[in-house]
Amino acid sequence: MKKLVWNNYMVYNPNTIAQRMNFVKQHINYFFPMNESEKIILDNYAKKINISPHQLYSFGNMLRIQNDLNNSVSYKKKKESIKSSFSKEISNNHKNHDESIKNFIESTKIPANIVLKIIKNTPIYKEEDFDESDYIKNLKKSYYDHNKDVLNRSKKFEVCLENYLRNLGVDFKTETDIIREKLHKFTPDILLNKPIIIELNGKEYPISWIDAKNYTLIRMPFVLESLRKQSNKYNKAFGNGAFVFHYGLDSSINIPNTLILDGSKISNADNNYCL
């Protein structure tokens, strides 16, 4: 059985993670995509503590998602009130609709993409054809660009993992291969054709699948729940496997029957392409 020796370099204690999370919390707006001024602040902090700014960006993304999940019931309860208030706001302001829409969305203290989904179903939104509003078009573009960047960087890290394993002579199927060949309903990023051994901290672990995660493993409830569900179904289908976290991991976290690896080994092997 082929064996790879792995070293987890980016392993952080919970206090270090908490300090970085608190900094991000203080410098992002939960209700809009990250803007350039926020990125500059996070970039400078990342440079100061010698980490990738993308680690901090991913913290911001996770904080926003968890905040939305925590408040989803509250948001639903406010739906009709938001529609009514929006219609009233626009009806009372006939001069600058872009400014009115901007001020209204900011006043709700609800993520802008959620507000947009609510107000687009109001008669006045359709009558005024607000999809053509400069403010709304720019807002939608900012969400599109943000989501596209997150997806592209995630895919890029998957490719880096594939290249790293190929260079070591590991034989596997990619997610694309699994789908194209209709091999299984579950699709980890890497499905090993034969199990391999990962040696970590002097211990050996047989694995049959690997999944790439383009973020730092931290104690975020929705993240841990998702990982445990994912690992459970993959382990039942293929045998035990591993998650590889691009920007390291919290040393206090354990995922049952699943190996937790940091991705610095992959990034360093690809001439900064994966950083």
Swiss-Prot record:
Protein name stated in the entry: Uncharacterized protein L539
Organism name: Acanthamoeba polyphaga mimivirus
Lineage of origin: Viruses, Varidnaviria, Bamfordvirae, Nucleocytoviricota, Megaviricetes
